[in-house]
Amino acid sequence: MFSIIKNDKNSNARLGVLELPHGKVETPCFMPVGTLGAMKALKHDVLEKLGCDLMLANTYHLYLRPGIDVIKKYGSLHNFTAWDKNFLTDSGGFQVFSLANFRKIETEGVDFKSHIDGSRHYFTPESVFKMQEIFESDIIMALDICSSYGIDYSEASLYTNITTSWARRTLRAYENRKEGYDGLLFLITQGNFFKDLRKRSTEAILELDSPGIAIGGISVGEPRDKYLEILEYNSSLIPKVKPKYVMGIGTPHYILDAIYYGIDIFDCVNPTRIARHGSLLTDNGILRIKRAEFNFDTCPVERDCSCTLCTRYSRGYLRHLIKSEETLGVMLASEHNIHYMFRLIKKARNAIMNGDFTKFRKLYLSKYDEGNFDE
């Protein structure tokens, strides 16, 4: 299922291979977010060309639209979307709990109001697992409570206890899954930013012995030093034999931090979201193409990049497309940013293999953070 190929000598970074129903995934792995089973402005064949083996889709959004019955009719999410690589499906917990004024958390589950039409719905750990079983997801995420940064201890403790209870119920459902379905279950640790709650949560989750472990509830608006503190602490509590996943991190420095502390999988909408607004990832930081200085710029966005944008088009032309709100501009910028993330991960893997990841991370971050294009 998960094999470690090499450990870095100077950090907890490691190379691994995750065996999933729709093929092998090399780790560390950045997972693009295709919320509704598709990447915004990127066709499947472009993703395949870029080397994407694992895409995230969201159970909450797919449940609301097109609906579980539609996907069930097709036999799986893979059949419905014509994507023959792997899917990780998020439980939808983050989306439900971000509704704030439109949901009610109970020990049994969560009652919430649709953001689309205001209709009311109820999720339980069992129902969320069943949906992902219908999807035939390659990685299934348990329903959890992602609490906000800054809540008090008692509330964080309550949410941690409920998450653990839901993890037990999800595991029972997983153990009784339909015959022939071999997706992997990842249970989620919580605890907010309290170390004793993190320890309690992680120990309880580890007792359940799920195939994979996710660290939830970080990168939710906290300062970077607090993020690093909890990332390092929570990761250290999880045995190295388990594949580790941190949800919702997608900036280069956060990802390299995660790799340093032994995280194998991460995802974020950030690369494509910022692309739609004209922000391009480069080794010198973020290039904001809408700036007037790029109007007459005949250079590619990045000289050593082999994506469609950089091998064919200029900064000036991309600026024209983005400023004119042309779809092609968004497509090119999105492809570039996803290609950039995959290229960064490949560089990190090579550095781990060569035994100089710590040096690579330090040099990369000094260049990225001090780049000419940062505001």
From Swiss-Prot:
The protein's Enzyme Commission number: 2.4.2.29
One record GO biological process: tRNA wobble guanine modification
Region (RNA binding): 248-254, 272-276
Binding residues for substrate: D90, S91, G92, G93, F94, D144, Q190, G217
Superkingdom of the source species: Bacteria
Biochemical pathway: tRNA modification; tRNA-queuosine biosynthesis
Active site (UniProt): D90 (proton acceptor), D267 (nucleophile)
Reaction(s) the record says it catalyses: 7-aminomethyl-7-carbaguanine + guanosine(34) in tRNA = 7-aminomethyl-7-carbaguanosine(34) in tRNA + guanine
Any GO MF annotation of the entry: metal ion binding
Keywords for this protein: Glycosyltransferase, Metal-binding, Queuosine biosynthesis, Transferase, tRNA processing, Zinc
Enzyme class: transferase
Residues reported in the UniProt entry to bind Zn(2+): C305, C307, C310, H336
Cellular component GO terms held in the UniProt record: cytosol
Pfam families, per the entry: TGT
InterPro entries registered for this protein in UniProt: ArchSynthase1/Queuine_TRR (IPR050076), TGT (IPR004803), TGT-like_sf (IPR036511), tRNA_ribo_trans-like (IPR002616)
Cofactor: Zn(2+)
Cofactor detail note: Binds 1 zinc ion per subunit.
The protein's role, per its UniProt record: Catalyzes the base-exchange of a guanine (G) residue with the queuine precursor 7-aminomethyl-7-deazaguanine (PreQ1) at position 34 (anticodon wobble position) in tRNAs with GU(N) anticodons (tRNA-Asp, -Asn, -His and -Tyr). Catalysis occurs through a double-displacement mechanism. The nucleophile active site attacks the C1' of nucleotide 34 to detach the guanine base from the RNA, forming a covalent enzyme-RNA intermediate. The proton acceptor active site deprotonates the incoming PreQ1, allowing a nucleophilic attack on the C1' of the ribose to form the product.
Database matches in HAMAP family: Q_tRNA_Tgt
Protein family (similarity comment): Belongs to the queuine tRNA-ribosyltransferase family.
Complexes and interactors: Homodimer. Within each dimer, one monomer is responsible for RNA recognition and catalysis, while the other monomer binds to the replacement base PreQ1.
UniProt-recorded name of the protein: Queuine tRNA-ribosyltransferase
Organism: Borrelia turicatae (strain 91E135)
